[in-house]
Structure formats: C-alpha cells, structure tokens
Amino acid sequence: MNQTVTENHRLRDTIIIGAGLTGLTTAYYLTRKGCDIEVIEQSPCVGGQIRTYHENGFTFESGPNTGVISHPEVAELLAKLSPTCRLETAREASRQRLIWKGDRFHSLPSGLFSAITTPLFSTKDKFNILGEPFRSKGNNPDETIGELVQRRLGISYLHYAVDPFISGVYAGDPMRLVTRHALPKLYQLEQTYGSFILGGIAKSFSHRSERDRLATRKVFSTYGGLSNLTKALEQAIGIKRFSLGAISTSLMPCEQGWVVSFTDSCGIVNRIHCRKVITTAPAFALPSLLPFVPDKQMNRISNLTYAPVMQVSVGLRNTYGKEFHAFGGLIPSCEQKTVLGILFPSACFDNRSPEGGALYSYFLGGTRHPELLEKSDDEIIRLITTGLNEMLDYPAGIVPDLIRIFRHKKAIPQYESSSTDRFAAINELQKQYPGLVVAGNLKGGIGMADRIKQAVEIARER
C-alpha cells in the first residue's frame, strides 16, 4: 500500500533564502567552490524584482532597468557568465541626464562652461561653490544628504541636482536619507578630503589597480533584458538546487546548526538540516522567517521604510521624428509634478522597441506620494498620455501602442536615521547565532552592483 509523503527531510551544507540577485550570485559562487547548497524562493521563478517582458517588439522591465558597473565584481561576474549572458553598456550618447525646471527639461551640466551657463542653479550658488573646498567638514555622522548638500553646495544644487537624483535612485527624500549609509562614497569624499571638489580631483589622480579599472561606472544591462542575467545564474547553479514556490518558510537554530522548514508547491513540508543559512529576504519578511528572535530585538532590524514605486512602460511605434539622446529625465520635487522621472531605455540599448519606435519607463509614487499607487489603471493611463504631450512634446491625444503598469508597494529600502541601529542589531544577531548571515538590500546598498558585491563577499567568507 502506497503512503502519501507529507514531510521531506534532507541535509545540506548551506541554505540560501531568496532567489533575487543577491541570493543567486551568492549561490553561483558557492556552487563554483563545490559547496552543497539549496536556494529557497517564495516565487515560482527566480530573479526577485528583476523581470523582463517581450511584447509586440518592445522589451521592457518591471523592476530595475539598469545597473552601474561601480564595483569590479560586476564586470567579473558578467565575464564569467558570457556568452550565456552578455553585458550591454549604454550608448555613449545616452550619458546626458535631463532635469525638469519650469516648463521643460534642461541638460544636467557635464563641464565647466555648461555649469556656468545652466539655468538649473542660482547665480549665488554658482559663485558660492568656489568656496566649497574651504568649508569645514561636518561632524554629524547621521547628517542627511539634503543637509550635507545644502551646507556645502547651496539650496539650488539640492533642489535641481541631488533631489531629482535621489528620486531616481531611492524614490526617497534627501532630507531623510543618511549620507554615510545611502551615499557612502559622497560621505567619504568629505570626511577624507574635506571637500567634494578636492576629493574628486584627488580621486582622478589616484592609482587604480587593473582590477579597480574594471569598475568603469558605465550604465549597463544585458542583451535582451536583465532577466537574461538571472536566468544565466539559474542555469549555472543548476535547477535541481532550487526549491521554488516555497511558502511558510522559517528557520530555527539547533545543536548541529539550523533547521529550515517550508511547504513546497506540492503541499509537502520540507525540513532541511544545514550548517549555515544566508537570508536575503526583505526586512519586513524577517519576523516570520526568524521566529526565534525576540520581538524587541527583531524590531530594530525590521523597522525599515520601503518606498512604494509604480513603473509604467510606454511604447510608441511612431515617434513623430523625436529622438532623445539621453539616459532619461528627472523631476525635482519642488516642481510639484506627479512623475518622479522618465527613463529612455530605447535611447540606451538596442532592440528595446521596434525600428523607428521608442520605449519609455515612467516612475511615480515614492515616499512623498505613496497615494499614487492607489490610482486606477485608467487614471494612470490618462496621466501618462497627458505627460507625453506636456513633458515630451508628443501630439496631444496620442495613444501609446504599449502601456504596462507595475505596482511595487514595498520597492526600495530607505537608509534613514534608524539604519545605524539596524546594522548594529544585524551584527549582534549574527554573532549571537553563528552560521546565520542576514544579507540583501536592507544593508550594504540598493543598486545591482551593491547586491553583486555583497554576494561575492559572503561567498568568499563561507
């Protein structure tokens, strides 16, 4: 008589929870070292927030559109995955960034002459910036980005350079994000050199190793979209190492290490005994994932604000002769527009739209306007089509050939004033429970490059 299997027990050396970019990259490098690993993922597919769609000749993303090669680990990973996954860097012409002021977009200055003549910044601040190298450096470790920039550069640089940049990266408020956590390189420029300008000059003359030069800071994707990156990682790791569609996942410490429990897509309870666990889950998922951690201790880790973001992919087969040779346009919050920014993927990469067409990615919401995610699809479509006319100068009443709306209610973690205590609490927890690693974008940076770098460092230490 056949018995129905209701529980499945097995042994592993290391369990990785989460098959986003951090989890996949960690699993990839551990697998290359010969470690016996398994990746547990709630979704039925890998990739986390990264998801590429192909529809009617358009290739668009529902999550991150691009990364920046800001760490050598990015170039090294993509070189290892080639030719299964091929690096695609943005066209040189798309290096231009646009900032909205008044009734149109203006180019962000890229040289001395444009910095002097730009209408984005006030005459007062243009003169005041000459004194930036002589200003005292700050002594508040939790100074926000907004406070730092206003102190060193002036209010117009905050409004028309840094604020839109923060909207584009964090969908957040520069007056709430702590510089040393959200923009650590900017913080270190002031702390090390006493000045952004002097620090930038010193950095440009500093010796860089051959490996350091791999960090070109170029904007990148992969040919065919970023899902090709996560699929290549999945293929290299091996599908048998994944448990997808897992629910009710939790872990408990035991004498020999850890027991990871979850219910799989067939309804079978799995219990895996392992030596180490690496979690890449978001902060809000940790209370149920780590039930053995007391509430007071857990609250220090899980009280992380996430910016809600709506991304709208807009495709046009007929561009009416318009060409935007830029990465995209950002809208400062002081301009009081509904849109945070518009990326121009088809200006950056090949085959993102049919020949002669264009693809745009609109971003709305953020920490300042979370209510926009509650608007209906019809309301959003009206807003977008109006914006095509008012902001990109397309004919009034134009109907896009493609509109796809993606709502992410907890999209981007905000490294605010609670971050210092959060990072300390994570370190304390890891020391208290050897073999546990708390990773993911709740610490160490939110960009794709940060995720890859963190994963490489974790795999190196295992």
Label each PLM-derived region with a short phrase.
Residues N2, E7, P109-F113, F324-A326, ...:
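Conserved flavin/dinucleotide-binding core of flavoenzymes
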Residues T52, A75-R97, S156-Y160, Y306, ...:
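A short alpha-helix-loop-beta-strand transition element characteristic
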Residues T31-E55:
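Glycine-rich FAD pyrophosphate-binding loop
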Residues H9, K33, L244-Y360, T367-E374, ...:
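Mid-domain catalytic core of redox enzymes
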Residues R12-V39:
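N-terminal Rossmann-like FAD-binding beta1-loop-alpha1 element of flavoenzymes
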Residues N56-K137:
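Dinucleotide-binding Rossmann-like beta1-alpha1 core, especially the glycine-rich loop
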Residues T22, C45, F284:
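Conserved Rossmann-like nucleotide-cofactor binding loop
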Residues G131-L251, G257:
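Active-site/ligand-binding neighborhood in enzyme catalytic cores
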